Amino acid sequence: MQQNIIKVIVGSKNPVKVNAAANAMTLLFPEYQIQTIGMDAPSGVPAQPMTDSDTRQGAINRVNYCQQHAEADYYFAMEGGVDHFEFGPATFAYIAIAHQQRLSIGRGALLPLPRQVYQALEAGEELGHVMDRLFNTVNIKQKGGAIGLLTHGHATRESNYTQALILAMAPFLNPEIYL
């Protein structure tokens, strides 16, 4: 018996993002074979988005680019960013999912950031580089991320993306009530 295939284009070749997409879709559609393909998709925002709106726009820009340059069943984009909220600085990710001319936007959990980390970001550094320097790691953004380091591995960048993707899929899982 041949298994049906769901093709997902991910707006990044970062293995954390591609794996999160595969994990989310495998959990949601266990009866299907999930084919995830990473694509270099420009965000159109700074390399380190420093606002909620830039982060959201980066995810939307990536998913739009993927739709224009590849054929798939679903298009996923994840954009990590930071902002300074009333309770302090935090990092988070926006999720954009496109399917059949519909778009769903979601956001991952907020991770409070140490003030010294946020100050380095304000000075123009990227979060992954700051965390690598602070924790003496190499390319942490393609591994557990700041989330993994600051939670001692109890959560990771990938687990946060996986959960956020599953939540952002709700309109596609229940199209009859998301009109």
Swiss-Prot record:
Q: Keyword set for this entry?
A: Hydrolase, Magnesium, Manganese, Metal-binding, Nucleotide metabolism, Nucleotide-binding
Q: What class of enzyme is it?
A: hydrolase
> What EC designation does it have?
3.6.1.73
UniProt GO molecular function: ITPase activity; metal ion binding; nucleotide binding; ribonucleoside triphosphate phosphatase activity
Q: Would the keyword 4Fe-4S turn up in this protein's UniProt record?
A: no
Needed cofactors, names only, are: Mg(2+); Mn(2+)
Q: How is the cofactor bound?
A: Binds 1 divalent metal cation per subunit; can use either Mg(2+) or Mn(2+).
Q: Name one GO biological process term.
A: thiamine metabolic process
Q: Which reaction does it catalyse?
A: XTP + H2O = XDP + phosphate + H(+); ITP + H2O = IDP + phosphate + H(+)
Question: Which amino acids does the record list as binding substrate?
Answer: 71-72
Lineage top rank: taxon: Bacteria
What's one Pfam family the UniProt record gives for this protein? NTPase_I-T
**Which InterPro entries does the protein's record reference?**
ITPase-like_fam, Non_canon_purine_NTPase, NTPase/PRRC1, YjjX_NTPase
List residues binding Mg(2+): 71
Its quaternary organisation is:
Homodimer.
The record's similarity note reads: Belongs to the YjjX NTPase family.
Q: What does this protein do?
A: Phosphatase that hydrolyzes non-canonical purine nucleotides such as XTP and ITP to their respective diphosphate derivatives. Probably excludes non-canonical purines from DNA/RNA precursor pool, thus preventing their incorporation into DNA/RNA and avoiding chromosomal lesions.
Protein name per the record:
Inosine/xanthosine triphosphatase
Q: Which organism is it from?
A: Shewanella oneidensis (strain ATCC 700550 / JCM 31522 / CIP 106686 / LMG 19005 / NCIMB 14063 / MR-1)
Classification of source organism: Bacteria, Pseudomonadati, Pseudomonadota, Gammaproteobacteria, Alteromonadales
